[in-house]
Amino acid sequence: MLSKIELMLLRSLETGKTYTPEEAAELSGLSKDAVLKAAYMLQERGYVRVIENVRTHYSLTEEGERYLKEGLPEEKLYSLVKSGVNSMDELRKRMGREFQIALGWLRRKGAVEVEGDKVVPKREPSFDERAALQAIKEGRGVDEGTLKTLMKRKLVTKSETKQVYIEVMKKPEIELEDIITDLTPEMLLEGTWRGKQFLKYDITIPAKEIYGGKIHPYERIIEECRKVFLEMGFTEIKGHYVQPAFWNFDALFQPQDHPARDMQDTFYLDRYIDLEGEIVERVKATHENGWITGSTGWGGEWSLEKARQLVLRTHTTAITIHYLAENPEPPQKAFCIDRVYRRETIDATHLPEFDQLEGVVLDRDVGFKHLLGLLKEFFTKMGFEDVRFRPGYFPYTEPSVEPEVYVEGLGWVELGGAGVFRKEVTEPLGIRGKVLAWGLGIGRLAMLKIGLKDLRRLYLPDLGWLRSMPVARK
């Protein structure tokens, strides 16, 4: 017994001929998806044969195109060596990062040898790879060994396309059966569905994928963090990306010669802001001699000029400490989720800009155990069952801890820093009470939740990966 779409497809096609889904759709009046659906059902009945041809295509990568145009690194290096430029230092200077690549390939070919600090030519090499790049660009074939080498060097990429053909094998003597394809609300209300025959659906048949809009997985995790703290009674605060070094460092009792304040760690602007007032004088005195905090301070002379310089904030603590200075009376519960900037070398776990979750609790009767309980509750709500705390050190908190969560396959992973603000931080700003504070890297948390090994993946426009991400996570 054939369904309506099977019958429509068979009636429109000729026995013994082969059609593409597009051709069959035009002849039958069905959509391409309906044609494929009917074809796979008819194949099971032996009326048609669905032929799937997979075509492999090779193309040059951006680097492959450049090497084809400018020459392979080993070609350039051999040309220099042959012309008399043999010094390793000079060759590195001329070729940059391509020097090691080129030297490695020339040594494999037996074309050069390294003698001391010199590269010496031995025999004329062949550069078949460049000819192969040209052949691939023109759509011609190359031998498998060369192809593997080019793909290993990431000069060539492989892609596959699938073409489906429908061949009609035979046609039965058939009549249109009264098979219902749609169950309507009216049929359910009136009960007319009883005794009817409904079309069976094969859920394994390929169909066109539909990609609906959804929130980016990283943005969703940020929103989860925000929701947790709002549910815990916190107020969300915001602040400027550009801050005076005073609020980013000095107000947090970070010494002016601290390594974190070096040019290689912080983005400094060539601009300054006016600073004056009682708070500035108190912070100055605290750094120099401890003021009235009971501390001896850092000693030396505190520089107002350094404190006046603007920086791209290195942590959102600059926002929370400023908030507490403006709201010094307890109780206060605030958090900030925002972007921060540091002069980091980009790799799988570091970026020069990233998101940080910062929070503070100001009250008279809170202590270290409350901080641990609060952080444990947050991580539990975020889906981490095993949480522990390791002693840490930060210039502006004492005691200090680093929270860690256990992840299957990775072990214990550190996710930030926390502690109780020192008196050298709170008293100069007029803050009345104890302050629990923490700063967590959301990027690393997101990597664990999503299962990524490379932080950069969160920011790449990889539609394939984004489409594969589920709308909801466990």
Swiss-Prot record:
Keyword Flavoprotein attached: no
Protein EC: 6.1.1.20
Gene Ontology terms describing biological process: phenylalanyl-tRNA aminoacylation
InterPro entries for the chain: aa-tRNA-synth_II, aa-tRNA-synth_II/BPL/LPL, Phe-tRNA-synth_IIc_asu, Phe_tRNA_ligase_alpha_bac/arc, Phenylalanyl-tRNA_Synthase, WH_DNA-bd_sf
Compartments where found: Cytoplasm
Reported cofactor(s): Mg(2+)
Predominant cellular place of this UniProt entry's protein: cytoplasm
Keywords: Aminoacyl-tRNA synthetase, ATP-binding, Cytoplasm, Ligase, Magnesium, Metal-binding, Nucleotide-binding, Protein biosynthesis
Co-factor: note: Binds 2 magnesium ions per tetramer.
Entry's Gene Ontology cellular component terms: cytoplasm
Group of enzyme by EC: ligase
GO molecular function, one term: phenylalanine-tRNA ligase activity
Residues that bind Mg(2+): E398
Pfam families reported in the protein's UniProt record: tRNA-synt_2d (PF01409)
Residues that, per the record, bind L-phenylalanine: T317, Q356, L357, E358, Y396, F421
PROSITE patterns on file: AA_TRNA_LIGASE_II
Reaction(s) catalysed by this chain's protein: tRNA(Phe) + L-phenylalanine + ATP = L-phenylalanyl-tRNA(Phe) + AMP + diphosphate + H(+)
Complex and partners: Tetramer of two alpha and two beta subunits.
PANTHER family membership: PHENYLALANINE--TRNA LIGASE ALPHA SUBUNIT, PHENYLALANYL-TRNA SYNTHETASE
Similarity comment text for this entry: Belongs to the class-II aminoacyl-tRNA synthetase family. Phe-tRNA synthetase alpha subunit type 2 subfamily.
Protein name: Phenylalanine--tRNA ligase alpha subunit
